[in-house]
Amino acid sequence: MYIGIDCGTQGTKAIVLDSVQKKVIGVGYAKHELITQSNGRREQQPNWWIEALQQALQIALKQAKNSPHFSPNLVKGIGISGQQHGLVMLDKNDRPLYKAKLWCDTETATENDILIEKLGGQTAVFEKLGIICQTGYTASKLSWFRQNYPDKFANIRKIMLPHDYLNYWLTGKFCTEFGDASGSGYFDVVKREWKREVFKYLAPELNMDEVLPKLLSAEQKIGVIKPEIATLFGFNENVIVSTGGGDNMMGAIGTGNIREGIATMSLGTSGTLYAYTQKPLLNLPPMIANFCSSNNGWLPLVCVMNITSSNKQLMNLLNIDIEELNQLAQQAPIGANGITILPFFNGERVPPLPNTKASILGLDSSNFTRENLCRAMMESATFTLRYGLDLFRQAGLKTSQIRLIGGGAKSSFWRQMIADVMNSEVVCLQEEEAAALGGAIQAMWANGEGELEFLCETFIHLDENSKAYPNLSQVKNYQNAYERYLTHLSQLY
């Protein structure tokens, strides 16, 4: 038995994977609150994640007990997936010094611009790190905290990412792995080491060797759970914890995206598109994040900020649910009778427009209908990901199949839209919780249950009924709408 945990923005999910029956036998979920302000602030209390982990895991364990083969004492390992980039800072007593600023926080855009300038510009940053620092990365959050809370900053004793914090709670071990570390903005993704020069600029008062976690490779286990954790859940004290990783890295493992030629597209609050490579790509467009993977390779990735979150904006406005959104959108033609939406309700990362606002364009008295607005909103979210796929194609990253995860992937209408807009085959997985599944599989790998390729082939299964193929006539119509979207976008970037 293995446990997978996914600590996301909206909540924490837990699964129990039966490695003998080769299926998930328990699932649990607990919601997170989110602190927001109009200036781009997006924060959470780190202890909320611990509370949610406990709640979600207890639900999953209770469900798993319906299986005649299950006992908590049979659990062998745990793997943690966590939202990337969040800044967790602990004092000498291991208490958080401040709320965790999240990946979607754009309050630190100015600090990020200053950081890039001080380091010599984007080209110089890329030469130092193998990646361009974006506003959502951890580095600018650290700079912001130093400027706004200098007294508290001096008391920092540990700096962590969200999944590191949960690993620390489970094991007491202060460490991280290359995948999540590569989204910090002070990590060299090519050499796979902390970048002393960059960290010294961000935190000259702090000793990098003391406050940053030890780096481990992905197949290592970081240790076993603490005795009190074993008691809390009824586990034995030999349960191992794998290195875990960022949610995108764990999503890659959980979708079998561990070899070249496959792309994973996540349709969640934000949207991500990523593909595995065996070597770091040094000729990528700056908007592609050249992350490390959590299986000791690399994971070029594009992140856009407004996917299901933009749909929810319209759903709240029209007082409709997701089924009604889909139904209304299907009643409008491709292109929404000329309406284009730039859905940047939370700013945007790709292209880098952290302070921009959303726009609805092309309205007139004849096309201003609920149906057209619903269609335009879903199309616009899809177009933001198509923009990312175009960057992949320009960089020579070839994919034969896109594997969809996230809540948006449940819509057959949206899946077909994505297939048409991307002009690519798309498919979902039988197990919906890909990041949590990736965590459980990584824990099996770390515990010597087999090579990762074998484990992915054994435990990951495509949902053949979900496959969608591009409809050539619709591909052309969507291309026309996408080109109109690009024309409007060019006024901003």
Swiss-Prot record:
Q: Cross-referenced SUPFAM superfamilies, in alphabetical order?
A: Actin-like ATPase domain (SSF53067)
InterPro entries in the record: ATPase_NBD (IPR043129), Carb_kinase_FGGY (IPR000577), Carb_kinase_FGGY_CS (IPR018483), FGGY_C (IPR018485), FGGY_Carb_Kinase (IPR050406), FGGY_N (IPR018484), Xylulokinase (IPR006000)
The residues responsible for catalysis, as annotated, are: 247
Under which EC number(s) is this enzyme classified? 2.7.1.17
- A Pfam family that the UniProt record links to this protein: FGGY_N
- What are the UniProt keywords, alphabetically? ATP-binding, Carbohydrate metabolism, Kinase, Nucleotide-binding, Transferase, Xylose metabolism
- List this protein's GO terms for biological process: D-xylose metabolic process; xylulose catabolic process
Q: Which reaction does it catalyse?
A: D-xylulose + ATP = D-xylulose 5-phosphate + ADP + H(+)
Mind listing the GO molecular function terms for this protein?
ATP binding; D-xylulokinase activity
Family from the record? Belongs to the FGGY kinase family.
Question: What function does this protein fulfil?
Answer: Catalyzes the phosphorylation of D-xylulose to D-xylulose 5-phosphate.
**Which HAMAP family does this one have?**
XylB (MF_02220)
Protein name according to UniProt: Xylulose kinase
**Gene encoding the protein:** xylB
